[in-house]
A protein has these predicted regions:
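Hydrophobic membrane-insertion alpha-helices, especially the h-region
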Residues: 1-6
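Early extracytoplasmic/lumenal segment of secretory-pathway proteins
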Residues: 8-84
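Extracytoplasmic ligand-binding site segments that recognize negatively charged/polar headgroups
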Residues: 67, 72-181
Length: 181
């Protein structure tokens, strides 16, 4: 009934293939029709691989079996990947649309990519609570208004959460009165 939603990803590019683009992204972030349109317009074939968590993505990139042109890790993972030599600097001459990104997001990105050399903000989101009003009414539980509401005993066994260690820790930290950061 209750879940957390988080969506913050960054696009990282390299250019190692001429008529083929290898992309590694979160599941359900780009509709297949967009890829089809891109291929039709450019003549470039897209190999589009999916991952569900940063922790699933990281060892694949680290192993180097596939040389991806674009990888879409979350903010904290970019810093780890840069520190471990897994991301190349982006040639921004090949990314003219960076001019269309709100400077607010580029500034926020400096927290993990201080000179914005390795990433481009691609999506931005928040962590929140989604709930089924009807199910809560059946359980006699009021709609949650704060993270601590998730510890209501009547919700035991009824909560679903996105598979994200970082989000789970954030919820627990908030419950204990700490900053989510």
């Amino acid at each position: 009934i209750v879940g957390s939603v988080c969506s913050t990803s960054y696009l990282h590019f390299t250019s190692s293939h001429s008529n083929e683009l290898y992309v590694y992204n979160w599941g359900e972030y780009i509709d297949e029709s967009v890829i089809d349109e891109f291929e039709a317009e450019t003549g470039i074939h897209v190999t589009y691989d999916l991952f569900e968590t940063n922790e699933e993505m990281y060892p694949v990139i680290e192993a180097g079996a596939v040389s991806y042109d674009a990888v879409c890790p979350s903010d904290y993972m970019i810093q780890k990947m840069v520190e471990n030599g897994l991301l190349a600097e982006i040639n921004f001459e090949n990314v003219p649309n960076i001019a269309n990104i709100d400077p607010v997001y580029l500034e926020k990105s400096k927290a993990f990519d201080p000179e914005n050399r390795y990433s481009v903000p691609y999506t931005w989101g928040t962590v929140g609570i989604i709930y089924n009003v009807q199910k809560l009414e059946e359980l006699g539980v009021p709609a949650p208004t704060k993270w601590s509401d998730l510890w209501d005993e009547r919700l035991k066994g009824e909560i679903l959460m996105q598979d994200s260690v970082r989000d789970a820790f954030m919820v627990a930290l908030k419950e204990l009165g700490y900053s989510m950061n």
